[in-house]
Curated annotation (Swiss-Prot):
Residues 27-37 have a biased composition (Polar residues). GO terms for biological process: regulation of transcription by RNA polymerase II. Belongs to the Mediator complex subunit 10 family. Residues 1-39 are annotated as: Disordered. The gene is NUT2. The lineage of its organism: Eukaryota, Fungi, Dikarya, Basidiomycota, Ustilaginomycotina. GO terms for molecular function: transcription coregulator activity. GO terms for cellular component: mediator complex. It comes from the Eukaryota. Component of the Mediator complex, a coactivator involved in the regulated transcription of nearly all RNA polymerase II-dependent genes. Mediator functions as a bridge to convey information from gene-specific regulatory proteins to the basal RNA polymerase II transcription machinery. Mediator is recruited to promoters by direct interactions with regulatory proteins and serves as a scaffold for the assembly of a functional preinitiation complex with RNA polymerase II and the general transcription factors. This is Mediator of RNA polymerase II transcription subunit 10. It is found in: Nucleus.
């Protein structure tokens, strides 16, 4: 894929494309500073994740959550690739090639089982997805709504806390002024103590 003036062209899906899944960005892992090289299965290779790849990803010096995320991402991409390959195989079934579709179905089942096995790793790595996000996905809503609502709630709570802080500061200033007026000798003693510090 050629790049023109540093910009990437969007990937075009054609009937001969290996997969509709996006190509990984070179040297980037979704904004994280650490890089882990996990081989993404291609259309010509078996789409199963080898245990050596998982072990290699876990052996690199990064936090456990990042390794689990990369493992999960690799397995999901593998499932998407296999489903795409299954669609291509089943769209063009010819005499004597029925076994290809059956093999792809079996590979999909194995990849889905491997993906299901990662749920225990997610719990161990404390990668909990908020229940609201899962419910939004189940109802077909955009999960970005949860992020927007969370940020709006956080901003309003921040404004409320800031208002309380300002009210306490104003009360302290009013109290200091009233104490200075009621006890002038206390004001002089306080001024001397601040000068000595």
């Amino acid at each position: 894929m050629s790049s023109t003036a540093g910009t990437r062209r969007p990937r075009q899906i054609t009937p001969t494309s290996p997969s509709p899944s996006p190509e990984p960005q070179p040297g980037a892992t979704n904004g994280s500073s650490s890089t882990i090289n996990v081989a993404v299965p291609s259309a010509s290779a078996p789409a199963q994740v080898a245990p050596s790849q998982v072990a290699a990803a876990a052996a690199t010096p990064v936090d456990a959550a990042e390794a689990v995320r990369i493992n999960l991402e690799t397995r999901v991409r593998s499932v998407v690739d296999l489903l795409y390959q299954l669609a291509v195989c089943s769209a063009d079934v010819q005499e004597g090639s029925q076994h290809l579709v059956a093999n792809k179905v079996n590979e999909c089942i194995q990849a889905l089982a491997a993906l299901d096995a990662t749920k225990d790793e997610l719990h161990r790595a404390h990668m909990m997805i908020p229940q609201d996000v899962l419910e939004m996905l189940d109802t077909g809503k955009n999960p970005d709504i949860h992020t927007r609502n969370f940020v709006n709630r956080l901003a309003s709570e921040n404004q409320y806390s800031y208002g309380q802080h300002r009210a306490v500061e104003r009360y302290k200033a009013t109290l200091d002024a009233a104490l200075d007026q009621a006890f002038p000798e206390l004001k002089a003693a306080q001024a001397e103590s601040t000068e000595t510090k």
